[in-house]
Amino acid sequence: MAFFSKFLNIKSTEMRIAEKSLKRINDLEKYVINNTDEELRSKTQFFKDLLKEGYKLEDIRDEVFAVAREATKRVLGKRPYDVQILGGILLDLGSVAEMKTGEGKTITSIAPVYLNALSGKGAIVSTVNEYLTERDAQEMGQVFNYLGLSVGINKAQMDPNLKRYAYSCDITYSVHSELGFDYLRDNMVSDMSEKVQRELNFCLIDEVDSILIDEAKTPLIISGGEANDSSSYYSADQFVRTLNNDDFLVDEESKAVTLTASGIEKANSFFRIDDLYNIEHSEKVHLIQNALRAHKVFKIDVEYIVKNNKIELVDAFTGRIMEGRSYSEGLQQAIQAKEMVEIEPETQTLATITYQNFFRMFNKLCGMTGTGKTEEQEFIDIYNMRVNVVPTNKPIAREDAPDLIFATAKDKWEAVGKEVERLYQKGQPVLVGTAQIEDSEIIHRILIEKNVPHTVLNAKQDKALEAEIIAQAGVKGAVTIATNMAGRGTDIKPSKEALELGGLYVLGTDKAESRRIDNQLRGRSGRQGDVGISRFYISLEDQLIMRFANFEAFQEVYAKDAGKEITNKQLRFAFNNAQKKIEGFNYDSRKSVLNYDDVIRQQRDLIYSQRDLLLISNEFEEIIRRMIKVFVKNLVAIEDHKLKSGAYDYQKLVDFLNKNIAVYIKHDFNVDEFKRIHDNELVDKVNQMVNDIYNQWLANAIEKTDQAYIDNFKKQVLLKTLDDNWKKHINKMDKLRSNVNLVQYSQKNPYQIYTDEGTKMFEDLIQTIAFESVLKVFSSPLGEKSLITAEIKNDPLYQQVASTFEYNPYLSISEQEKQLLERYNNVKQRLNEVEQQNLQEQSYKDPASDNLENNPEPKTGSQSQSEHEMVLTPDTVIDPSIDTNQWFEEINIDDFINVTKKDSELESKEKEQEEVKNQETQPKENKPAETKVDATKNQENVSEELKAKEVATVVEEKPKKVSKAKSEKLKVAKKVKPKDLESKEKPKSDKAKKSLAKKETQKPKKPKITSEVKIAKVEKTNKKAKAQDKPKAKVTKAKETKPKTEVKADKVKTKTAKTSEAKAQKVEAENFVNKIVFPKNKIDLKLEKIKLK
């Protein structure tokens, strides 16, 4: 049909629909122009409401396009032409709109993008580079913002949050490659919230032929590096440098290189092996093949450049650097060895997709180009898009002159130099287009010799200068040398003087592999009806004729015409045929890439859908049990378990299970378990056994943690197992794809072999994922029986210790349980010791207070216990209205340990003071001998004076000042009396009162814990402050009854003994601290059943 349409001028269905719609839009324009800005903006919400009511996009298309045209005129000052509206309608119909260069494709895109963004599902505009992405988003974004729609820009190396925002906008502008990479990365995340893309709804591709045709052969690959020995690449590179032209053969058409017999012999000698093509040397053959291609096929400044000591690939169609791209399968490393730059690790494919399969996932796909009609059949076959040619707004005035052909490249370059020099002297601007960077360097040197000022634009220049260089290419006297990247997507506007001199002259120096590329270069001139001229200079030594025509025969025939132009029509026909031949070859190559990718596409879709299910599902229990069923079925199905008769050998089965899986599922199988079981019931029996083991695993896991933790654990196991095995599967498929062509020699279809083998490999992948997932779950320590019993977990002390425990994510749950249990036991043991000390203290009775039991002193207002005061005992019930956090907010664990450690010391000192006091109350006899102290006496017989002196000495060792704040707390603490003394406070007589008052000045008090007093600091301050006041009277008394020499000796002895005792207590306290590690910050110790003294 397309063939007859070309000659009969039959319009396509899309074109007929578009022309009718254009008439209705023009009729609506006279009503829309009367709307105010506010009314025009409100149309957006009006259209959205219509869609919610059930209207379809095609139902509101005419009015939406009329509104978009008016908004464009008001914001940009440019009213879209009818041909631009016509092109926009064709785009909305899902076809390719071919619009000649300079016809305003960017403005054409506004209306269809606006219409499809109204659905709220997002509209994406794909461009060929980041410069056009930013330019179009900024310029066209003004119109969309005016109409109330948001616009986002997506670029490489952006933060994921910024990418997520860009995709969430109503309209997103992005480079085409980044769209594919974001899709692959989204299917590698561990949580749905990490994804950046949303539904692939609508995509408009600018320069659609460049993306869907020219770059379709190169798949998008996300790879990870693997550390390889770089010496192997250098070794292969050195060998290739020793070869002569007779040692290898090069196929120019397929760019394949093979060793001849002499080359193989040299390889055997160089690597000191017997047979290069022995299976054990297959890796070496692979290295040599890559080194040969790097040296004999891939050329610097053609396929790649060296920039900043790195290999940068060059796009053969645009001349631009393909940033972030590299060759796979070791070819990149071979080129790096050739150019003597740093060899990067060879990569392993982690995820891959082709442009064809990615863009076919959009609900609606359309595109614009200046040259797409020649590839219409490919657009129809692969993308189901028809190419419709949009008429120009003004007739084309450019002259396309016939090609000039020369016998040699030297003659061609001389003719190009003379023509450029002539045009420069005339003042007519000229754009010299080259197919390769190498060619642009040649003409650059020629023009330097001729003293012609010029500008060079190729992949070696900064991209930021591209727009500026192209903008100046149309002024009078401008000479610009550029690769095929020149002006792609940009506008060259000739000056008024240049138009008077004939407009822009486009001079091509080589025929491209596709007629589309040549037409794109011609289209730089003659935009919007401007005058201009285009012409190609070609030779019989150009790459096109050498690869796809019988150029040797042509060279022999036309050798006599060296130095002059060849005007043979048959030769021009040969060039055109060579272009068609290479176009067909490239189409077959793209079709083959798509066919092979279609095989893995089905597998990829299934894996990615299952992966998304894991990310959003909570039914991990069901998934695991299904995998157990697959796991058991595969185990039992192994043929080694069967006898020759076909019946199962249960002993072999049990031996196999115990050898391969018992260590993972923590269960030893016994042949007795399988007695009286029919072969048909074997799978169900083993499945039941494994499920019972799993149920026990699950019960143990729940005892250790909660269901949410278990679900997350299963999720991570399943995701990691799926991802790891999918990566391995992709690499296996890549190797299969590389080697499958060898089956052609056995008269087999490579594609069919790839499909069959790939299907088997995928089935193995599913089984492997299930097998490994089940074993990983069973082998996890999470299912082991918990070390911490339910009784311990219910203990408030354990709950307090657990709340302050810092979990280490790098340790297993069992190891963390051991640490937590050890800490709990240490804390419990220590607190039990403290409680025992408190009980012993309560059992001690003061002799002086025995007479006070029957007449307790009534409590005063300051002494009575307030509603916020509380003594913590094992039976205490805490009022929930009391802020217990305030009690302990300043407690330091060091204070807690010091207080508990010194309790016994303080008790002994109190006892000694009581004995001293009792001695003082008895009548004294003036016997000097009684004041002397025998140094050899046991400590039990030391006199009361010496004990008093010891107390005074200990107190005087480390005098400490009490701050004002602590003194205030001390005053409050003094008002609080121990509970066991409250019933003994009122003496029966004045003498008893005086005795008690004297005792109170000597004996340190232990305050009760209140909400106003921080117990650790109060106890410490109370004891130290009172210790400073106690010794004064005693020191004086000792001086009166003891000689100085004896007192001095006693001081030395007492100090030495106390120092040793203090050191021992310090060591004991440090050991305890080392066992119990608490956070350094202040903690809330809710000790509900412990009394602290």
UniProtKB/Swiss-Prot annotation:
Part of the Sec protein translocase complex. Interacts with the SecYEG preprotein conducting channel. Has a central role in coupling the hydrolysis of ATP to the transfer of proteins into and across the cell membrane, serving as an ATP-driven molecular motor driving the stepwise translocation of polypeptide chains across the membrane. The keyword rRNA-binding does not apply. SMART domains: SecA_DEAD (SM00957), SecA_PP_bind (SM00958). It is a peripheral membrane protein. One of its GO terms (molecular function) is ATP binding. The gene is secA. Its EC number is 7.4.2.8. It is found in: Cell membrane; Cytoplasm. ATP binds at residues 84, 102-106, 491. Keywords: ATP-binding, Cell membrane, Cytoplasm, Membrane, Nucleotide-binding, Protein transport, Translocase, Translocation, Transport. It is an enzyme of class 7 (translocase). InterPro entries: Helicase_ATP-bd, Helicase_C-like, P-loop_NTPase, SecA, SecA_DEAD, SecA_motor_DEAD, SecA_preprotein_X-link_dom, SecA_SF2_C. This is Protein translocase subunit SecA. Belongs to the SecA family. GO terms for biological process: intracellular protein transmembrane transport; protein import; protein targeting; protein transport by the Sec complex. GO terms for cellular component: cell envelope Sec protein transport complex; cytosol; plasma membrane. Residues 837-869, 904-1062 are annotated as: Disordered. It comes from Mycoplasmopsis synoviae (strain 53) (Mycoplasma synoviae). HAMAP family: SecA (MF_01382). Residues 904-937, 944-971, 978-1062 have a biased composition (Basic and acidic residues). Monomer and homodimer. Part of the essential Sec protein translocation apparatus which comprises SecA, SecYEG and auxiliary proteins SecDF. Other proteins may also be involved. It catalyses: ATP + H2O + cellular proteinSide 1 = ADP + phosphate + cellular proteinSide 2. It comes from the Bacteria.
